[in-house]
Amino acid sequence: NLGANVSETSLPLTDHALAVYYIIAPSEASANLSRYDGVKYGLGSLNASTSAQATESTRGAGFGDEVKRRILLGTYALSAGYYDAFYKKAQQVRTLIRREFTDSFLKFDALVTPTSPNVAFKIGDKINDPFQMYMNDVCTIPVNIAGLPSISVPGGVSDGLPVGLQFIGPQFGDTTVIRAAAAYQRATNWHNNHPLI
């Protein structure tokens, strides 16, 4: 109806994207946030009498549990003896995932996937298991690590909760992604439906 030819494809390497992301992103965060020592960057401690006390009292100040968890994970991945096994290998797999997407865009102008494997959380709900929370990113992470443009639009409702639909384009294909998503929204009414709160 919208002038698109639709067919299925498979990107098997994207199965590794979540692991790749949760090695690369925490490693980069760890490297960037290591400067927050409370002296030049970060929250300083006015009550410390030594630099060691200042560092100890301010090192984690201002960071939530999830940020601290990711900094520790990244520091581990970048540490001696683990850099090649984790960070370097993750970067290599990232390159393969990017290439797989690039190859798919030789055949397709855009890809369409769910935004998340689950419906939206109910207000106030959350998952206390960090791994399960990370799994909610399984559809969007591959696109991010490949450096591609994407947009999520309302794609329907399941059990009264909204479901997202993700449009993905080739590198620098932002206009294609926006046009495809806009055409979908003009043809559907999901973006005008609001769940009862």
Regions found by a protein language model. Give the residues of each.
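Short, surface-exposed loop/helix-turn segments at secondary-structure junctions
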Residues: 46-50, 85, 89, 93, ...
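Gly/Ser-rich, acidic/histidine-flanked active-site/gating loops
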Residues: 1-30, 35, 107
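Glycine-rich phosphate/pyrophosphate-binding loop
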Residues: 42-69
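Structural helix-boundary/capping segments
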Residues: 1, 5, 35, 40, ...
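Short alpha-helical scaffolding segments that buttress acidic/His motifs in well-ordered protein cores
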Residues: 20-21, 67-75
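Short, hinge-like loop/turn segments at secondary-structure boundaries
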Residues: 23-28, 129-131, 169-170
